[in-house]
Amino acid sequence: MPLYEHVFLARQDVTAQQVEELTTRFKGVIEANGGSVGKTEYWGVKSLTYRINKNRKAHFTLLNINAPAAAIQELERQQRIDEDVLRILTLRVEEHEEGPSAMLQKRDRDDRGERGDRGDRGDRGDRGFGGREDRPRRPRPTEESHGGEEEV
């Protein structure tokens, strides 16, 4: 059976619990049509680049699916009917990635906290270069230095 990565966006005003219920319902649709869902990832609420149906944010969820095309068509049909789902994207892939997806890794990297102070290194200051006023002025270009053609 073909492998798919499926991402859907749920409205910002639904709770994370309701998104889990949606995910469970969509898994049931896939399994009822002879497929299986390998991995699910909830990426959380993220800001959208542009508004979709008056929503500025959305819950993002990824499903790794192993199912026939008919199951995917039924899943997408169910999601188009559901008012809580804003957008869907299904991609056919050669193989599923092992481990967390790039979005989940990015979120983990962002959760590592502040960098802290500079310790004994002190303030960066001017780094020994001085200000602009310390630099010598550039010579003004002359007519000869433009490389223009001479008039005959």
From Swiss-Prot:
A single GO cellular-component term on record: cytosolic small ribosomal subunit
TM ranges: none
Superkingdom in the source lineage: Bacteria
CDD domains, alphabetized: bS6
UniProt-recorded Gene Ontology molecular function terms: small ribosomal subunit rRNA binding; structural constituent of ribosome
Region span, Disordered: 96-152
Alphabetical GO biological process terms: translation
Keyword annotations from UniProtKB, A to Z: Ribonucleoprotein, Ribosomal protein, RNA-binding, rRNA-binding
UniProt cross-references to InterPro entries, sorted A to Z: Ribosomal_bS6, Ribosomal_bS6_sf, Ribosomal_S6_plastid/chlpt, Transl_elong_EF1B/ribsomal_bS6
Family statement: Belongs to the bacterial ribosomal protein bS6 family.
PANTHER family to which the protein is assigned, alphabetical: MITOCHONDRIAL 28S RIBOSOMAL PROTEIN S6, SMALL RIBOSOMAL SUBUNIT PROTEIN BS6M
Function: Binds together with bS18 to 16S ribosomal RNA.
Protein name in the entry: Small ribosomal subunit protein bS6
Organism the protein comes from: Xanthobacter autotrophicus (strain ATCC BAA-1158 / Py2)
